[in-house]
Amino acid sequence: MIKTNIAPRAYALKRPLKTMTPMTAASRPKLWRNDITGLRALAVLPVLIFHAFPSLIPGGFFGVDVFFVISGYLISGIIFRGIASSSFSYLEFYEKRIKRIIPNLILLLTFVAAAGWFILLPDEYANLGMHIDASTLFIQNFQLLSEIGYFTEDALRKPLLHLWSLAIEEQFYIVFPLICTLIWRLSRSVKMIGIAAALIALGSLAACLSSSDRNFAFYFPLTRFWELGAGILLSYSETFIGFSTSRFSQNVRNGLSIAGILMIVLPMAFVTESAAHPGLITLIPVLGAVLIIAAEPDAFFNRTLLCWRPMTFVGLISYSLYLWHWPLLAYLFIAVPDATPSVLIAALALSFVIAALV
């Protein structure tokens, strides 16, 4: 980690902020929920299938939007709990993010660079170098914005195409803790209104740009932060406002769970890449993810599907699985343009093996 010589009186990394006590212990976001781990699987599996067999799940790309909601909910929960207990540290927060993200990413980039030497043409390999640099700096979304659309045929020759979403998440990790520090002394109601207003503004921006400048809307962080913000709003309302669906009947929570699953699965099954995305259609799976998380672990699909052991297993390796599956497929598309379904399935199976090992 980078050491600093800034005097403690000038700025303290663990300086206590004016805290807000959570409403009740029961209303705080749970530190670990198997159903959210299973929700990661529901997010990543359609992405994998869409990349290998796009006709099977034409809207599988919505899985990334579900990931954004999960990340917003979980990361903001960590920050909110830390600030509420006067124990939040920027250094500790970023250290944990680095330990979780960087080792696997470095291993992946090393593999991509080595394999690309044998598979790519010289000009393609030179371009790959720029993508590796951009991925290392977490600005791959901007690199792709200057080059290519996500759904174009040429995108199949970009082994690091998928890292646009990781870049947006890391940009969020950099910005959000600082925003929390700046606004924390405001009242609860003002913060709630501010979060909601930001969601509406950024969501409206995404909806407008998705029809006029699709690539900009797809890759630009401000047109994606509202999806993370949906998870943030739920986390904040649980932690500090006291919102919890536990006060509702079991049937209501079951209904929220079922509705959430349908709002995720149906767009994945029927919406195609020609839709204006991210836009109004994206609101459906985003709200679906919010409903599932809000429904709590004992809701119907949460306990039966998302807590199912195979789903939680996939959820636990979802980050590695997402990292590794696309470079394997991309190099396969380049080296074997007419790869059979069995070969594509083998590539996906290999990504599972690697994800389970790294």
What positions do the PLM features span?
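Short, Lys/Arg-rich, polar N-terminal cytosolic tail immediately upstream
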Residues: 2-32
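Membrane-interface helix/loop caps of multi-pass membrane proteins
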Residues: 20-358
